[in-house]
Amino acid sequence: MGIKSLYQIISENAPDAIKAGEIKNQFGRKVAIDAYVKTAQRYRASTDEEQLTNESGETTSHLMGMFYRTLRMVDNGIKPLYVFDGAPPKLKSGELAKRTMRKAEAQEAAEEAKETGTAEDVEKFSRRTVRVTREHNAECKRLLKLMGIPYIDAPTEAEAQCAVLAKEGKVFGAASEDMDTLCFAAPVLLRHLTFSEQRKEPILEIHLDKVLEGLGMEMTQFVDLCILLGCDYLDPIPKVGPNTALKMIRDHGTLEKVVETIESDPKKKYVIPDDWPYLQARDLFFNPDVRPADAPECDFKWTAPDVEGLVRFLVEEKGFSEDRVRNGAARLTKNLKSAQQSRLEGFFKPVAKTEQQKATAKRKAEEKAELAKKKKKEDAKAKRAMGAKPRGAR
């Protein structure tokens, strides 16, 4: 789920934190990728018309997505490192239960749509029933090993592990669609990196330092804002939308002060849920269960693919095209050996500002100009006062 409306807040209040570019612009970079998001994306992109299973009826869409989208990244000079989720924190159990319920409801709706609805209805509800299993993850790990692409298992949250690897300089950034990756202090969040080429979505670089600068916040305030917006650990406070949440943190500075203000309000405009352990949520963001970047498990490297192993697994066991698999292996061998070249940061351009963003920027510029004008007047007044003092006065 990530953080509700966080991208909207950043795009409106810190637009310079977001840069858009093509996948080729990531050339020469090592990137830690949230493997759950990557695996699930392929499922959600699949439709009934695509070949989701082999002749034996086994699901192969997760392997197809992992193989071809990884090839696309390597073709563009990216060195991917996949990070798989471990056990979720206990505080996340509520969100996971909701997801299970939503999938069950979607399954019922999909079955009903098959009887009475359109093909679009069937596809829409079928996508919501996606569930990545341990077997899917195990097969993806086997595939990555044969491809020569490294992966690690996170103790808990994959995005937290991606963030610490980026923070410690082991990789350039963390690739995930979950905005809460920024709450774990990832210096750079890459969105849409693992989308298929057909999606034609630009790769978004979101820089944490620019986010904090644009919002005028320290990291603790930013995390408090994200908790107030609603995250995987806690639901948002009823009736507190993104603009209200932003104003509350700016006005009061901390969640403690926000909670105190809400609870002392005689009108009871907002009501904090009985079970709302925001201190625990904050601690999970600042002290996640992750492997240190210098741990042996994080000493990863990229190797040449096992071509015959790939053929045995993908062709003989899973029914893939041998020509395509061998061609993909050749691309891996060639591109993983490619010498690193200098990067041109000019590849990226700032995201075009919306009318609302332009209006916000104009307002801030006017406020800044007004403050400068006021200060100039005060300085001139002080100077005149000094000049008006009688001679000999001290």
From Swiss-Prot:
Subunit structure: Interacts with PCNA. Three molecules of FEN1 bind to one PCNA trimer with each molecule binding to one PCNA monomer. PCNA stimulates the nuclease activity without altering cleavage specificity.
Keywords: DNA damage, DNA repair, DNA replication, Endonuclease, Exonuclease, Hydrolase, Magnesium, Metal-binding, Mitochondrion, Nuclease, Nucleus, Phosphoprotein
Name of the encoding gene: FEN1
Cofactor note (record): Binds 2 magnesium ions per subunit. They probably participate in the reaction catalyzed by the enzyme. May bind an additional third magnesium ion after substrate binding.
Source species of the chain: Arthroderma otae (strain ATCC MYA-4605 / CBS 113480)
SUPFAM superfamilies assigned to the protein according to its UniProt record, in alphabetical order: 5' to 3' exonuclease, C-terminal subdomain (SSF47807), PIN domain-like (SSF88723)
Enzyme Commission code(s) on record: 3.1.-.-
Region of interest (N-domain), residue spans: 1-103
Segments of this protein annotated with the region I-domain: 121-252
Region (Interaction with PCNA): 340-348
Record field: compositional bias (Basic and acidic residues): 363-382
Binding site for Mg(2+) 2: D178, D180, D232
Single Gene Ontology BP annotation: DNA replication, removal of RNA primer
Main localization category: nucleus
GO molecular function: 5'-3' exonuclease activity; 5'-flap endonuclease activity; DNA binding; magnesium ion binding
Family designation: Belongs to the XPG/RAD2 endonuclease family. FEN1 subfamily.
Any one cellular-component term (Gene Ontology): mitochondrion
Binding site for DNA: R69, E157, G230, D232
Record field: compositional bias (Basic residues): 383-394
Cofactor (UniProt): Mg(2+)
UniProt modification remark: Phosphorylated. Phosphorylation upon DNA damage induces relocalization to the nuclear plasma.
Protein name, entry field: Flap endonuclease 1
